[in-house]
Amino acid sequence: MSFFKKIFSKEKKETLDKGLEKTKTSFLDKLGKAVAGKSKVDEDVLDNLEEVLVSSDVGVTTTLKVIDRIEARVSKDKYVGTAELNKILREEIAALLSETNSGNATEFEIPQQDAPYVIMVVGVNGVGKTTTIGKLAHQFKKAGKSVVLGAADTFRAAAIDQLQIWADRTNVPLVRQNMGSDPASVAFDTLESAVKQNADVVIIDTAGRLHNKVNLMNELTKVKRVMQKVLPGAPHEVLLVLDGSTGQNAFEQAKQFTAATEVTAIAVTKLDGTAKGGVVIGISDQFQIPVKYIGVGEGVEDLQVFNKFEFVDSFFK
């Protein structure tokens, strides 16, 4: 289809291709076996395709949606050869991703506004939350924006220390307090500091404990409420960070965090080390939240703005 034109730079596209290599190889291998010995898409092929999508961590709900769409095309066209299946899947998955990822961004951008753009970052410990914040700070700074970080995950000394390392590395200010301090107090101080400095972007880390949903909800609600005292409308974005390598566990994390607070965007990390990249498709569709960033490598440049067309192209090429 014509919308699969090249959007990324050659270097960025190569990084994405490399990061999705394990996912692509696994998926295409399974797809090849699903259509082996078949010349047309029939009920057996669709049953096999359903297994392929579910085992590729696309998720049952999204898989059934894709199968229904392909069934409709087969029914309409009467005959669809298995050789066309790759192309049809590309088109249907791109269309599905377009429903929640309407933009076509390729660069790290924020909306034009007078006040700082505030991003509150949520996610369980160990998913790459702090690293994602550090890489975001780097990318926004590289794009000419001034950035302030806030260490509101005050329950782990390591979280504050890790964020300090990233702040030093990217040469951006970090607002922090002692371990055990009130997270809302840190958020308040961070926004006050950012407003005084006339900063463009504020990124605030929050605690990643999931053992008690009510406590998590109350804590995040309080942090947001306190932010609004300094800056009405803040946070402008609530970014949920998920570890792509955990597959179905990422769905469970998304379920818990979307129940605890309003999540407006998702970052999926660690896709380079896994064959579970299908999780990006399922998470975005099932929760109707756009995927904004994906992590496709360990380097500071390997956090990319998610572009649905480039993702699908790398997934199926």
Which stretches of residues belong to each language-model region?
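Primarily NTPase-proximal linker/entry elements flanking Walker-type ATP/GTP-binding cores
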Residues: 17, 21-152, 159-179, 187-204
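Short beta-alpha junctions and helix-cap segments that line functional grooves
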Residues: 3, 105-107, 136, 252-254, ...
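Short hydrophobic/aromatic residue motifs in ordered secondary structure
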Residues: 60-62, 156, 272, 300
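Conserved catalytic-core segment of NTP-binding enzymes
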Residues: 162, 182-197, 211-317
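Short, aromatic- and cysteine-enriched interfacial helices/patches
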Residues: 3-10, 28, 35-36
